[in-house]
Design a protein with these regions (language model features):
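Non-heme di-metal
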Residues: 1-207
């Protein structure tokens, strides 16, 4: 006798019936904050970039490369891992938005590189990021938590990444901006900071 197993029921998301109003609140905040790096006039920073010393340029490129690595992890591993642990389709939707914006953030650093930097210097920074033991260890630790089957620890790790791991890298462009350097680049970073503040808040709230 053949046993027929019915397929699991698939339900469409209904934003008119929500278990947690915070999901809609954060969704609306994220969508109203939407932006793309192409809208920021980074080319206005070319004179300021050229006035930086070679050491300052190298430091800036390396900082942004490190941030790109973290954004890549959050886009491809972190947010998807949290999405898998979501309790409702509304949580899944918010996490999918967060995942996409992390990809936008990573794209933003490439926009900075292509506008201000020489290709050889950027290539050297990417090679450095792959060879730098502390940076790679930081990435490995995040991935260990995201790949494990412990939902609460994933959220804790994600909040740490969305807060001090990112923000420690944001200090340099804010420092330059406070001195009238790379001000348009700093405007782009402020858009990223605005996003990360919401990401960290939401994930921490769900914890």
């Amino acid at each position: 006798m053949t046993t027929v197993t019915s397929a699991p029921l698939v339900r469409a998301i209904n934003w008119n019936i929500i278990e947690d109003d915070k999901d809609l609140e954060v969704w609306n905040r994220l969508t109203s904050n939407f932006w793309l790096p192409e809208k920021v006039p980074l080319s206005n920073d070319i004179p300021a970039w050229q006035a930086l010393s070679p050491m300052e340029q190298q430091l800036t490129i390396r900082v942004f490369t490190g941030l790109t690595l973290l954004d890549t992890i959050q886009n491809t591993a972190g947010a998807p891992a949290l999405m898998n642990d979501a309790l409702t389709p509304h949580e899944e939707a918010v996490m999918s938005n967060i995942s996409f914006m992390e990809a936008v953030h990573a794209r933003s650093y490439s926009s900075i590189f292509s506008t201000l930097c020489q290709t050889k210097d950027v290539d050297a920074a990417y090679a450095w990021s792959e060879e730098n033991a502390p940076l790679q260890r930081k990435a490995e630790l995040m991935l260990e938590y995201y790949r494990a089957d412990e939902p609460l620890k994933k959220k804790i790790a994600s909040v740490f990444l969305e807060s001090f791991l990112f923000y420690s890298g944001f200090w340099l462009p804010m420092y330059f901006s406070s001195r009238g350097k790379l001000t348009n680049t700093a405007d782009l970073i402020r858009l990223i900071i605005r996003d990360e503040a919401v990401h960290g808040y939401y994930i921490g709230y769900k914890y």
